[in-house]
């Protein structure tokens, strides 16, 4: 490819691109005087000055690569345009006319003294101190300089254009397209104001070349490629072309420097030898682009290196007839010149290696890429400093290089004295295959890049005796394997392929073998006799033959990387192998039935093996030694001599009679039939059904064996232990029964020390207990209200008290307090001071009474009693006048005068007087003498003063309806005497029944009521209860009559003193036109289940009708 002398494809006559000239500036052979074509078909001149790479660069007589003439005529532009002969206007590369006329500003006139532009002073930053802040400001604008501050940027640019300073400063004040000085030279393209004069100044062209304008600014008298001058001017990149030895990229011809990248071409006139592509020395047979000879791509029929140091054969591997040298990475070169990376050569190497020194990385010219020395007398070090002598120097990682020391991975080295990169001997390559002069990856003598022979072509199309780049060899000489290990000759010693296939003739890339060779070697993934202890990288050793990636091994082999000992042979990756007894495959069992191998073997990953169990299946071998079951299957070995066997993960194992120890499967029992096996275990979930002497039960199943064994985890024990366990349980139960009489909770320690509370062993007591909120301060009624201290002396009642005498009632302390438990009210009348505290203490009985409604009345009555006692203390008005019931009735019938007094319960106590002296009792109203606090507390209980007409009307109505008072302040009509005279039938239908309270209101039943089952005295105060602005029927009685029964009939209810109260004065509002009164009436009309009848604003009387009295409040 790079340095062979054949054509592109197997052809013996043509060059790679149809040319026989130099490739990239290579020197033509002096023995070829005929005219040759260039690389692209351009005809070469026959003079002694040879053409460079493309026949144009620096050549005065060759054709231009793009059709332009390479002669010294004046019309040699690259694209065919003719150059002008005018000295002041020569043509550019694209035919543009160049001139020396400066840019003009159109019709604008130039002001005087304005052509200085920016040439007065070079640009510098202008600094100025800020007077306010004291900070120095640095201005990066040229218009801030004092020399140019009168001009703007555009003005300065215009002045520079007028002065011809458009492209920067030069010696003559003009510039070129790419800022090269243009004085009198021709610039690159001639269209941007450049001067295309044809003077012979010494300035360069487009890239700094001489002024002769060529293709890109070269002179008209030459045809250089990129502006190289024809005479005494530079070449393509500025090199001088006045001599006849220059190369394509500007190397000086008479010097000994390089050509394209520093190499020099030979000067046939003086016989000077120059360097190669990258500066390496070139002998008489110099290299081409990369050090090869000067044919098409460095191909030469002589024995020199190619592109990478290989023998100069054709572009592609056509057959060669000579033995070549080493390949690209240190392979040995048979001739004087080496390859690219450290190969031997007569002159300097690729990167400047000296003739007698090391290669690319400092190794000697005779050594290999990584320090492998093939010269027995060399004393220089390898790549990493190892000595390449015959002495026992270490390898890359310090291993010994003699025959007694191992390699990098512990393999024994052969009898060679020195090893390579990984400890292998120099007779083998980097991975252990033997060689005489190996390449980088262990190629055989004088191999190529990937192990091919040095005489081989690039892509395995060569017909020489050596291998190609991928190792296939079409000859019958001894050669080595290629990249993937296949071998293309019929030599007796060949390495294996990449995946273990043998390298015979007609081999395919992945191990299929076409011929039978007596001895072969493995390659990268195949076993090798010298690399790593006769094993391959992935465990296959091929002392005789190698396996394929999915094929069969036909010979005995040793174990490799993954532990399988390949003693006669190893199985394929997915299949078995027809050779002797070996290890199982990855997914299958080993189908070998060799009985001569007594060694132990192991099962495959998913299948069984001859002697050992596979990963998922039992073993099927007949080996006499130990074998194990697969991971999912049993061990199916039928050998009776097996000493140790194990079942599979999920299955049992039918081990023979000679097994001594066997374990059950994970989910199955152990079906061992061995008579000598004294110890067997059951499966995880199954019982042990063997007849062994000692067995354990499964996890969830009992042990059904006849011998002594343990039960399962969640099951009953076996029959052999039933009697002993039953006896033990009976004994324990008897002991528990003896103690159970004393402790009803058994003998468990959890309950033996437990204490039983009284709530468990004793009946439930009443839950009502005395509440103790705080032991230090008891919450009682006596603490809430301050008790009145007793007086030291009490006044006795006068015996001549007319009132008491008339009433003829003795003062009884028991009558001073009246407690009505059914009505939950306490009425405190006139009592002595010594009994007041006792009365309050008795009232605490109702403190936690669930039937009570409120203590508001109690508190208000007590306060009113205290105020009344203080007001009436010492007066006779404090006495109470009592009359008999008959006298009271007579007084009502006679309509005597009535006096009213305010009593302790807040109501009006009517005193029936027998005096007929006409004294007006209306003037004896008592004003309330209470403080402001008492007024607020009893605002709703304040007695409203009736007019004399109202009082007379109330009592006249009671007297006319045959009414009588019951309990306290309650009256009933008909009276009790009348109702007592009714028969039972009459009591079932009592018409016009009225029950009322003298202060709060009354109820009139509009339908007959049934009083047969109702105590008459309990109608007022118990069944029917009046409170301020409230009438309650069956307040605390759960059993109410049904509709139409008892007193649950239609009725009219009248409530007294239902005034709206003014919040500012706390007084009732009696004005009918007041807004609050109107609002109050509207609210009364909205009461549910009632029919509004009337409201009197003066008296505060509210009258409404209900359909069912017992269901309303």
Curated annotation (Swiss-Prot):
Residues 362-535 are annotated as: Sufficient for interaction with MEX67 and KAP95. Residues 92-172 are annotated as: Interaction with AFG2. Residues 1-35, 49-91, 265-341, 371-606, 678-736, 868-939 are annotated as: Disordered. Residues 916-939 have a biased composition (Basic and acidic residues). One of its GO terms (cellular component) is nuclear pore. Residues 967-1109 form the Peptidase S59 domain. The modification Phosphoserine is found at residue 886. PROSITE patterns: NUP_C. FG repeats lie at residues 2-3, 17-18, 24-25, 40-41, 66-67, 79-80, 94-95, 167-168, 189-190, 249-250, 297-298, 351-352, 370-371, 431-432, 470-471, 510-511, 525-526, 532-533, 616-617. Residues 536-732 are annotated as: Interaction with KAP95, not MEX67. GLFG repeats lie at residues 55-58, 205-208, 214-217, 224-227, 235-238, 259-262, 276-279, 288-291, 306-309, 327-330, 339-342, 359-362, 382-385, 395-398, 407-410, 420-423, 439-442, 448-451, 482-485, 497-500, 572-575, 585-588, 604-607, 630-633, 648-651, 665-668, 683-686. It is found in: Nucleus, Nuclear pore complex; Nucleus membrane. Component of the nuclear pore complex (NPC). NPC constitutes the exclusive means of nucleocytoplasmic transport. NPCs allow the passive diffusion of ions and small molecules and the active, nuclear transport receptor-mediated bidirectional transport of macromolecules such as proteins, RNAs, ribonucleoparticles (RNPs), and ribosomal subunits across the nuclear envelope. Due to its 8-fold rotational symmetry, all subunits are present with 8 copies or multiples thereof. NUP116 interacts with the NUP82 subcomplex and GLE2. Belongs to the nucleoporin GLFG family. PANTHER family: NUCLEOPORIN, NUCLEOPORIN NUP100_NSP100-RELATED. Functions as a component of the nuclear pore complex (NPC). NPC components, collectively referred to as nucleoporins (NUPs), can play the role of both NPC structural components and of docking or interaction partners for transiently associated nuclear transport factors. Active directional transport is assured by both, a Phe-Gly (FG) repeat affinity gradient for these transport factors across the NPC and a transport cofactor concentration gradient across the nuclear envelope (GSP1 and GSP2 GTPases associated predominantly with GTP in the nucleus, with GDP in the cytoplasm). This is Nucleoporin NUP116/NSP116. It comes from Saccharomyces cerevisiae (strain ATCC 204508 / S288c) (Baker's yeast). The lineage of its organism: Eukaryota, Fungi, Dikarya, Ascomycota, Saccharomycotina.
């Amino acid at each position: 490819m790079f340095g062979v002398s054949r054509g592109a494809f197997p052809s013996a006559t043509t060059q790679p691109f149809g040319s026989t000239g130099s490739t990239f500036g290579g020197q033509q052979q002096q023995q070829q005087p005929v005219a040759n074509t260039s690389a692209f078909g351009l005809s070469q001149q026959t003079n002694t000055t040879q053409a460079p790479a493309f026949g144009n660069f620096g050549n005065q007589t060759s054709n231009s690569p793009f059709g332009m003439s390479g002669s010294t005529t004046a019309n040699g532009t690259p694209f065919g345009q003719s150059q002008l002969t005018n000295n002041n206007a020569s043509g550019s590369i694209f035919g543009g006319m160049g001139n020396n006329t400066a840019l003009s500003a159109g019709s604008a006139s130039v002001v005087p003294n304005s052509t200085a532009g920016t040439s007065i002073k070079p640009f510098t930053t202008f600094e100025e101190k800020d007077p306010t802040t004291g900070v120095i400001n640095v201005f990066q604008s040229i218009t801030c300089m004092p020399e140019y501050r009168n001009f703007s940027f555009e003005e300065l640019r215009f002045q520079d254009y007028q002065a011809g300073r458009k492209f920067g400063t030069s010696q003559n004040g003009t510039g070129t397209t790419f800022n090269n000085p243009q004085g009198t030279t021709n610039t690159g393209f001639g269209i941007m104001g450049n001067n295309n004069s044809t003077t012979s100044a010494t300035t360069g062209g487009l890239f700094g070349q001489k002024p002769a304008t060529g293709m890109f600014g070269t002179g008209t008298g030459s045809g250089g490629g990129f502006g190289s001058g024809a005479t005494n001017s530079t070449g393509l990149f500025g090199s001088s072309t006045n001599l006849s030895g220059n190369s394509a990229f500007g190397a000086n011809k008479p010097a000994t420097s390089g050509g394209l990248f520093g190499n020099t071409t030979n000067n046939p006139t003086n016989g000077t030898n120059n360097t190669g592509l990258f500066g390496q020395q070139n002998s008489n047979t110099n290299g081409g682009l990369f050090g090869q000879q000067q044919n098409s791509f460095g191909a030469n029929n002589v024995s020199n290196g190619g592109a990478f140091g290989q023998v100069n054969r054709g572009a592609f591997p056509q057959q060669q007839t000579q033995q070549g040298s080493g390949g690209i990475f240190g392979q040995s070169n048979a001739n004087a010149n080496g390859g690219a990376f450290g190969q031997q050569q007569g002159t300097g190497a690729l990167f400047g290696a000296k003739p007698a020194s090391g290669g690319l990385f400092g190794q000697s010219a005779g050594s290999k890429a990584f320090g492998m020395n093939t010269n027995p007398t060399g004393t220089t070090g390898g790549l990493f400093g190892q000595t390449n002598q015959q002495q026992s120097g270490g390898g890359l990682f310090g291993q010994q290089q003699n025959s007694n020391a191992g390699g990098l991975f512990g393999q024994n080295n052969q009898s060679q004295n020195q090893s390579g990169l990984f400890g292998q001997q120099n007779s083998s390559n980097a991975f252990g295959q033997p060689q005489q002069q190996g390449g980088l990856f262990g190629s055989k003598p004088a191999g190529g890049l990937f192990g091919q022979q040095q005489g081989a072509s690039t892509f395995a199309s060569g017909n020489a005796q050596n291998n190609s780049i991928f190792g296939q060899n079409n000859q019958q000489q001894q050669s080595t394997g290629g990249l993937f290990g296949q071998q293309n000759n019929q030599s007796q010693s060949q390495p294996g392929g990449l995946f273990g296939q043998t390298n015979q003739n007609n081999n395919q890339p992945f191990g299929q073998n076409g011929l039978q060779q007596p001895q072969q070697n493995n390659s990268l993934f195949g076993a090798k006799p010298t690399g790593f202890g006769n094993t391959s990288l992935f465990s296959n050793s091929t002392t005789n033959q190698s396996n394929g990636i999915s094929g069969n091994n036909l010979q005995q082999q040793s174990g490799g990387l993954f532990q399988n000992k390949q003693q006669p042979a190893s199985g394929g990756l997915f299949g078995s192998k027809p050779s002797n007894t070996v290890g199982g495959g990855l997914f299958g069992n080993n189908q070998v039935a060799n009985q001569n191998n007594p060694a132990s073997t192991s099962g495959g990953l998913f299948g069984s093996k001859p002697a050992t169990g596979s990963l998922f299946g039992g073993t099927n071998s007949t080996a006499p030694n130990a074998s194990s079951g697969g991971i999912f299957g049993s061990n199916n070995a039928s050998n009776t001599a097996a000493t140790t066997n194990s079942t599979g993960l999920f299955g049992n194992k039918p081990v023979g009679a000679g097994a001594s120890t066997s374990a059950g499967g994970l989910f199955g029992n152990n079906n061992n039939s061995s008579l000598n096996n004294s110890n067997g275990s059951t499966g995880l979930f199954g019982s042990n059904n063997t007849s062994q002497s000692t067995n354990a039960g499964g996890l969830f199943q009992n042990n059904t064996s006849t011998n002594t064994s343990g039960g399962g985890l969640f099951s009953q024990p076996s029959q052999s232990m039933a009697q002993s366990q039953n006896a033990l349980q009976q004994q324990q139960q008897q002991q528990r029964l003896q103690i159970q009489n004393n402790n009803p909770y058994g003998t468990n320690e959890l309950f033996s020390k437990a204490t039983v509370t009284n709530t468990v062993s004793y009946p439930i007591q009443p839950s009502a207990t005395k509440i103790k909120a705080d032991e230090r301060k008891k919450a009682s009624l006596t603490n809430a209200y301050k008790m009145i201290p007793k007086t030291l002396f009490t006044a006795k009642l006068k015996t001549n008290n007319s009132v008491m005498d008339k009433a003829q009632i003795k003062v009884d302390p028991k009558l001073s307090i009246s407690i009505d438990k059914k009505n939950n009210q306490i009425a405190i009348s006139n009592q002595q001071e010594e009994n007041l505290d006792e009365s309050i203490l008795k009232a605490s009985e109702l403190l936690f009474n669930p039937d009570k409604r409120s203590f508001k009345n109690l508190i208000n009555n007590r306060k009113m009693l205290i105020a009344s006692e203080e007001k009436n203390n010492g007066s006779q008005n404090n006495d109470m006048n009592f009359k008999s019931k008959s006298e009271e009735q007579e007084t009502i019938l006679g309509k005597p005068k009535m006096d009213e007094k305010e009593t302790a319960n807040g109501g009006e106590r009517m005193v029936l007087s027998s005096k007929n002296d006409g004294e007006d009792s209306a003037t004896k109203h008592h004003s309330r003498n209470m403080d402001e606090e008492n007024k607020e507390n009893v605002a709703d209980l304040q007695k409203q003063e009736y007019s004399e007409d109202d009082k007379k009307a109330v009592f006249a109505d009671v007297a006319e309806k045959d009414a009588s008072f019951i309990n306290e302040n309650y009256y009933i009509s008909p009276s009790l005497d009348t109702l007592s005279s009714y028969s039972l039938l009459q009591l079932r239908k009592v018409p016009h029944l009225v029950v009322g309270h003298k202060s709060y209101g009354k109820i009139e039943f509009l339908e007959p009521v049934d009083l047969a089952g109702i105590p008459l005295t309990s109608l007022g105060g118990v069944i029917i209860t009046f409170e301020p602005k409230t009438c309650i029927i069956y307040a605390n009685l759960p059993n109410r009559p049904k509709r139409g029964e008892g007193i649950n009939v239609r009725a009219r209810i009248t409530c007294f003193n239902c005034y709206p109260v003014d919040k500012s004065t706390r007084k009732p509002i009696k004005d009918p036109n007041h807004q609050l009164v109107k609002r109050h009436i509207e609210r009364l009309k909205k009461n549910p289940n009632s029919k509004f009848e009337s409201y009197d604003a003066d008296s505060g009387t509210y009258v409404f009708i209900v359909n069912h009295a017992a269901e309303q409040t």
